[in-house]
């Protein structure tokens, strides 16, 4: 126990020296070796025994993770590493690489300042590597590169030492190309990865060795020696001469920024308040004596302590008993415990200063993305944006009726822990619907509900989440209130796709200062008057008021928007969410007496005008797509392409690398169920494949009616398709 106590003392001492702290994430594509790398770094830092590292999967502390052999949640751990005779505190987050858990990566990126990007030397950069790198650069997180599984190049692909260097060079070039395209200004500032400079390390996480140019100078081991050791299968000597943790952690300390350096640059990206205000300055300088500013990036449940909110402390210090505000709620909470992580364990400490990753209990109101502060009314941090959208839904029911109240509570809890999950109650069928990133995501959540929360559940077959949209612009439609005293004239038209993507990426929203929002929309091609008239944005739809001087309109606008939002949540054709629609109010006639223009009159009037308008404008379904990447031996390529095309897939690109064929395709999510088993049998089990979210596209006309019919039947709606006249009161 003595060693552990010493470790805790070192960690608590270093916590107070921001220049000695590095907050880093490890990111990569699935199975490129993130968790094995994390474990060996821990072993090197004396956190777990060296014999067990890599097999223990310390970071995968969840049974589900150990069973599936993949990381599902982001794990936090703190450790100490000595570099140039000085101790440094490294807060490490291991993130999942599976596309269904991309949400965890996005959240982890908010807490860290640097990222070790892990790439498999044999497979090279893969789609998920691009996705995670893009998330890191968007949050201004600086990357360094670790090329893993170098031994496989030598022993499995039998390349010679010259070919090995060429291949490794290609991997580095490709990563730099990605950085340059994703964030040109940071690339110019020197964020490229460069082996000669020392921002790239090569090695094998499993066999616990790594080499970089600074390490070669230090140990005298050359590339040729590495090649010879691998060829001879003598990994042990390599691991003794060039320990993995030393090469990687030295690189992290030398090249990745400390919190003070990082926050100067990052605060303006993730916080839109006044940089010169007291709290703005305090965050930019990671001031431990300033007001508290803490961003929650994860919520988990501890059986003893209750909800634990983990996140990054940008300003101030956390201590027990302090009272704090949480964004979005009016009442204060009292902090109960403050702790840091060591693997899956939390260690309670008295105080945590700015620049650290902290775990806090007592913040009942907090959700992922919350801002926690001692200032009343502080401008919250920008909300965390996820790259994908939920595309698959299952209905969840409790096996035993007595568990129903517990199930409702558990679903609320699960949604709080994982913000990429959407939980809704279907009012008509009474079912609870769970929408997630993919089949695996929902399977894992369902398993956890049963295992951790002890609620037995049954889940329906997965259902695809569709969207409704329109194809053309129509003349204004009149919506009348039930008492006939109020009329609204609204037309709908498709919203420009550039504006849609600006809304989705969070660039345009209603909380922006009006002039700034207006200018951004004009730059994207919207007319000035329209940009001026925006009164509501909901999902990727907007509502514009183009009327002039209508009495009482201001008082009723909120109700008109309620009607608009109701339709956007559930469109007229299939009651699926609506996307990419612009609704424009051009005229209105309102009763002078407020009693005759209440919610029961105004909401139905605006709702019906939009519903009828959408049906007149060719209401159509959009279906979600996934990009599918398949690596397969060239001889078996035919089976793989046939499998993809048989699922309405479009082959976007085919290339070859050695004897491997790499196929890139786009396939509707509806056709992807059961793909794992089928692709295995089509390619004799030799295909490696992965997916990422591929956006939405219009459903082909030939199958549109069938799909609409199936959705309506599932939701208990009438078989006949609705007509515009059904929504207009004559």
From Swiss-Prot:
Q: Which Pfam families match?
A: EFG_C, EFG_III, EFG_IV, GTP_EFTU, GTP_EFTU_D2
Q: Name the positions where GTP binds.
A: 28-35, 94-98, 148-151
Q: Which residues carry this modification: Diphthamide?
A: 596
Q: Which InterPro entries match?
A: EFG_II, EFG_III/V, EFG_V-like, EFTu-like_2, G_TR_CS, P-loop_NTPase, Ribosomal_Su5_D2-typ_SF, Ribsml_uS5_D2-typ_fold_subgr
Q: Which domain of life is it from?
A: Archaea
- Quote the subcellular location field of this record: Cytoplasm
Recorded hits in Gene3D superfamilies, A to Z, give: 3.30.230.10, 3.30.70.240, Elongation Factor G (Translational Gtpase), domain 3 (3.30.70.870), P-loop containing nucleotide triphosphate hydrolases (3.40.50.300), Translation factors (2.40.30.10)
Keywords in alphabetical order: Cytoplasm, Elongation factor, GTP-binding, Nucleotide-binding, Protein biosynthesis
The UniProt entry's GO CC annotations, sorted and at most eight, read: cytosol; ribonucleoprotein complex
Main location class: cytoplasm
Q: Which GO terms describe its molecular function?
A: GTP binding; GTPase activity; translation elongation factor activity
Residues covered by the tr-type G domain: 19-228
- Does the keyword section mention Nucleotide-binding? yes
Q: What does this protein do?
A: Catalyzes the GTP-dependent ribosomal translocation step during translation elongation. During this step, the ribosome changes from the pre-translocational (PRE) to the post-translocational (POST) state as the newly formed A-site-bound peptidyl-tRNA and P-site-bound deacylated tRNA move to the P and E sites, respectively. Catalyzes the coordinated movement of the two tRNA molecules, the mRNA and conformational changes in the ribosome.
Q: What's the family?
A: Belongs to the TRAFAC class translation factor GTPase superfamily. Classic translation factor GTPase family. EF-G/EF-2 subfamily.
- Name used for this protein in its record: Elongation factor 2
